[in-house]
Amino acid sequence: GADATKKGYTEGNGYIVSWCVGHLVGLKFPNDYGNGWNQKWSFSQLPMIPDNWLFQITDSTKAQYNLLKNLMNKDEVTEIICATDADREGECIFRYVYNMARCRKPVKRLWVSSLEESAIRKALSNMKPMSAYDNLFNAGYARARADWLVGMNGSRLFSVRYGGKLNIGRVQTPTLAMIVQRDAEVNGFVKQKYFTADLNCGAFTLSSARIDDEKSADALVSACDGSTVTISSVKREVKTDKAPKLYDLTTLQREANKAFGYTAQQTLDYTQSLYEGKLVTYPRTDSQYLSDDMAQTALEVTKLCDSYFGFGIAHTPDIQKVINNSKVSGHHAIIPTSGIATADLSSLPTGEKNILTLIATKLICATAPAHKYDAVKLTGICNGTEFTATGRTVLDMGWKRFIRQTDKEKPDEKALPAVSEGQTFTVAASNGEHFTSPPKPYTEDTLLSAMERAGNEDYDDDTEKKGLGTPATRAATIESLVKNGYVERDGKQLRATDKGKELVTVVPDEVKSAKLTAEWESKLQQIEHGELPETVFMSGIQHFITDMCRKYGSVDKSVSLSDGGNEPVGKCPKCGADVVKGKFGWYCKGKCGMNIAKVYGVELSDTQVKGLFDGKSTSYTSKGKKTIVRPEIVENPYNGKMYYQWKTERGNKNG
């Protein structure tokens, strides 16, 4: 192989191997086009639709680009092998460099889903010419131009319209809109009390249907207490829970967030590291199945997982359950590789070890028998009213025997005793008080699910997804929302900031429509599969941008953007004036000097600061050490004046 290490590449055995560091070449920004686009933002510049798209070399990686250019154009190099990630972005990363370097040498494509030596050797013997992947590139290039057109035009259009800087994104804005809507549902929820009449039959309890009026519930309880209930129906049905599908990236990110609290980006990073370490297959996949040619490999790997992950349970894998060629377009589901047999798994970092365990467990579960149980529903009549109880008895644990604490499932219903129709019980009746449950704020788990389902409300689980973004880009979308200050993390929850709410409030529905963006994603998939010319898609995007600029190309003075969302977080404990968020933190509008910037170098979130002004403690972690912060108002012993401070485990931070 190419084992002679040089600066920026390796060489040997007739090969030169080098690499890209992300996107070495990308689309130029509007300011680089001239056309007046580099002037102060105005409606007259819009819409910005380049006649010829221009590319630029990324400054931070220019040296690596120049190296690749020189290597490609060396006289002794007769053929190029593209070995970037086998997906849209990988195709674009290579072709942008190849085209910018004006290289015209023949190219073959190395398409691999595993970095094991055996997989690479097999792929090397099955390479196709670059032209076989033109549709993949067309989809990636169309996606990049669509993002540019929506983002660059939308940001300038609505920033000028409302007189403040707004960042618009083709996927980012609809995702933010979903978070804002969920937060509004949570904040606007009014819990409602309801009741059930519960009949204690000794070994089990029968309950009435929901009763909204407490007096009616009390009357039913009084009528039934000490009375006899007669079992009118005993329904038993053997049911099965099918084994779960294998992981695609999104389901892996969701379950890792649920089990370990990992962000989508953390899970992608851990899985990418495992992939580069030859321990799992390609991570950025949207398939939950394997292809026919993977059957024998999957069987061998499943047996390895049984051995190396200490399940110790007899298991005959049914590999055919996870084989479906029609569900694998680019890459198959994520599974471990045979590399786990020789690797020192104990030396893996905790995050990677946890992710590998999830992936191995999923392969075991997916090839295991169904979980079977006997579902029972009892119905009883007391004083003319129907009461019910449900339970289940496990008949065969099946795949669930392999579930560990990483899959924090809800406990199954308890088994009910053997009861016959016509049997009677003397009961003690009580009034059960309940409350309706509020909608929950998004976590990365539930947001990823919502992004995946967006635009798919009328489709079943096995229909090809549209969704917001792709498995490869959803993590970056969430991170961008957080980085730009539109969303903040509050524990596992993702909450919209005032800045995020403001943006969603002012932009029109067509810009924040999840359905429209999902339809665009569906069209990109059609381009990738050769079912739609990319020119048709781009024409539609250009018409959308032109119409949007025409419709909203005027100043709207009815809306005034705040500077960072200046909604008061509380009253100043020193002078009583409003405390608001500014560019450098929170400050008192009464100018008494009270401010909150950072506590021990850590910037608190909007939610944490609001909590402090409500008298609540909050906590943060810095350099691995957790610190509790609580507000205090104390008297200065030297002048008798009251002042505000933070009381923490590591000392005081005066405000």
Predicted feature residues:
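Basic, low-complexity terminal or inter-domain segments flanking catalytic cores
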Residues: 6, 72, 155, 188, ...
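Metal- or metallocofactor-binding catalytic centers and their adjacent structured scaffolds
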Residues: 214-247, 253, 438, 515
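Amphipathic alpha-helical transducer elements in NTP-driven molecular machines
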Residues: 14-17, 21, 58-69, 74, ...
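Short, polar/flexible loop-turn hinges at active-site or ligand-entry regions and domain interfaces
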Residues: 53-56, 84, 104-108, 129-136, ...
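Conserved short loop/turn motifs at secondary-structure junctions
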Residues: 83-86, 163-165, 236-245, 254-260, ...
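C-terminal or mid-to-C-terminal helical accessory/interaction module adjacent to the motor/catalytic core
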Residues: 66, 75, 117-201, 236-240
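Intrinsically disordered, low-complexity regulatory segments
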Residues: 1-144, 148, 317, 410, ...
